[in-house]
Amino acid sequence: LKTILEYLDTPPYLRKKVYPKMWILKHAGVLPPIKSPHHKALINSKDIKDIEIRFGFVVKQNDSLYVDVGLQKLIRYNGTQLGKKVLVKISNKGKLLAQDISKEEIDGYWGYEVQLSDSLSALLENRNCEILMTSVEGSPFTKHVEDLMRSLKMSKNLLVVFGGPKFGLRKILESENERITQKPHFLNMFPKQGTQTVRLEEAILGTLSIVNNYLNA
């Protein structure tokens, strides 16, 4: 699952370079595109007038490093990450030059990262953020909107946690027999949902849309 998620986050023009033929990605072609801002279209290098930010893949050519960023030619790379996917800022000062840039330097959303945790309790422990745990067993979201938004404005960071297809968050925590010290917001994002459960992919999109709507209100 981690590989599939990382594959989806990779711009289409880089996927064949970053991911060789893998059985786990055999049916990845039928997955819907995410159309994230960093999934940019192929363009001509002549169209870069000032600054362009793109993901690329670093290769070596004639003892120099270049980065493939989905243009019709490779761009000279001022870095050291040979054979890796990199996020670069391309500047045009007579010649195109690419150098590393971090997501924190970019204004707006620029893709996600995938991390693995040994357990749910380990994921929740020592988090410097507000924690929203979604569950049909939680309190209705609409009754706690003000508290959650007030907390978010103070912390600036939010961890949203969803249950799995077979077990909800309460059962998962009970099975781990661990206590979490930080008090989370345990909320039902879809009260009166009319079904026993909400599909995970629908819950993710719905929850993020609801939270984003209130944050930008």
Show which residues each predicted segment covers:
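Post-transcriptional modification and biogenesis factors for structured RNAs
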Residues: 1-217
